[in-house]
């Protein structure tokens, strides 16, 4: 044969590696800071205001309940020695029930806050994700890394494009 088997293998490998090298040179990567983008979105500001208002209302309700419990507890402690045993036991049971309702209210308030957060923020994050995908497709990048969510200790700006401004533009944010 004109070519030896070893030379043929080297030639085949070079032909396989050459396109990979050319392909690797065309890879484009991007990165963003999602927190910078989200915090500039009007939808985020509105959602945060609603969450703060709900948190304030729940906090006031809890405080009112705690003050009522504290008042009844102090009254009970002042009167317990002068109350008949049956009445003292009934009031103590009422206090225990109040305490249990308070704990249930606190747990429910926490669940309500989490649900409200999810409900209000889901559309914000969907809008952000849609904008990221649109910019990624328009820029022809393979990946867009979120520097706010993924701790990447080093980004070579010559190899990775900062797409934060373009995502903001896509969202109509300055």
Regions found by a protein language model. Name each.
Residues 1-11:
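Single conserved hydrophobic/aromatic residue that forms the stacking wall/gate
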Residues 11-12, 22:
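Cleavable N-terminal signal peptides
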